[in-house]
């Protein structure tokens, strides 16, 4: 060590490591700690702390030496306004504040005052303020950030007031190239489009007649993403008429009731998308939880018109089109010759026939996601198995998928993500995957009721590569999974960082002990678990707490423990575990890994 100069150590070795490994290195010796603090941290220009939720003290320790940052990403789940304010400054060009469950919109005024040079801003906030207060703070922020090129504002909650962005159109900087807003009323979105108007007339009245606004040729928005109460023809026509230069359009709506026939999306709106001749990415999704509301006025003819109007699409995402059949979806696959990403949700008429000639039309496919498409069977997957560039294959809730297609999947040498949730696969199918060289890093077998402990052994205890590459594994809701499967995982998976075994009723304390022992004995290239979900594992006892305490699970960032015996002693468990690990997030609320779907409902007492 003495022979290696400090500069060589910093420049040639330490600066090549990510933050996680830098922290590990700094714990080895005072020499290495000094090299990290003085030689590496001051030179960092970008820092991403989204993988765990630091408290105030941890954040201060991490950022103390980072004096050259221009890009910062924070998981703000447990941070207050004062902590966030302390990291802001004119040096920042890019700022991402995620999961701000404790922050009111006052933080917007801090950003506008302290970060005048921002180019990129992302904010995920809970609904904590009245619309008037939020609008006032938002206006102040936008006026203080005149150079923004990308802006993402997501407000989440049960009853979010969709008028929160009512005045945003008056303050948006003309430098903006990418915009995402959630939530937004359709009527407000149309007024916003009028603000972006470049030439010609715009449509703001039901009869589509209105006066001209003064043109604003300086707006060059290329990416637009909106979560709305309604997607309609009026909205699409307003968007395409005002932003013909759009490259990416992402629209999702969540209507409370069935739209009126004259105020819904029809062929007219889909055909109008052709005015955006540079459009390469399109997402149209209708999401209605517990309600049967969909795009009922769109059938194959509407998709025919879309495929003819937008032949340059490289990414297509459609959800809530139950009347579109194979002919409609196949027209997209055949017309869009450069299609790389194809996602369809809830298409009840989509079957294997749509993919009959997929290699002859869309051989460039890299991602295919077919979620809740009940007519899709293994035959479609066999056809997709001929797409040699496929990297992501999502067949979640396609219940007719069986073992017969897994040999085809095993031939996909670039596949890194595979979702078989709810499929009718068995232990024999796991043997096919386990013997293959497919480099899968993310695998979901959730709800695969015919896969047992033996199947997990076939998957991971063979000569294939998956045991070496797998980093995320979901075995939730699988009645055939017990401690034996977990023991196999700890023995074979050296790269695993995320594991979900929620609602696995036969998993006991022995599994927690096995995972803890594996963590403590990890050597060489073995990684540590970062996220573990044992929600509703009813066979776990409070005796497993001893294995969740130090020194076990040293790298754990998130632990889901809802509906277990731990939940009955929430305060004691939180004090015992989080007292030793202030950066660890405990979730008793049934969230998926990392609370990606429910952070806005958490309170400080839960962390």
Curated annotation (Swiss-Prot):
Pfam families, per the entry: F-box, LRR_6
Domain of life: Eukaryota
Keywords on record: Leucine-rich repeat, Repeat
Protein name: F-box protein At-B
SMART domains: LRR_CC
Species assigned in the record: Arabidopsis thaliana
Cited PANTHER family: F-BOX PROTEIN AT-B (PTHR13318:SF176), PARTNER OF PAIRED, ISOFORM B-RELATED (PTHR13318)
UniProt repeat feature LRR, residue ranges: 51-76, 77-99, 100-125, 130-155, 228-253, 262-286, 295-320, 321-346, 347-372, 373-397, 398-422, 424-447, 448-477, 478-503, 504-536, 537-563
Domain F-box: residue ranges: 9-47
Coiled coil start-end: none
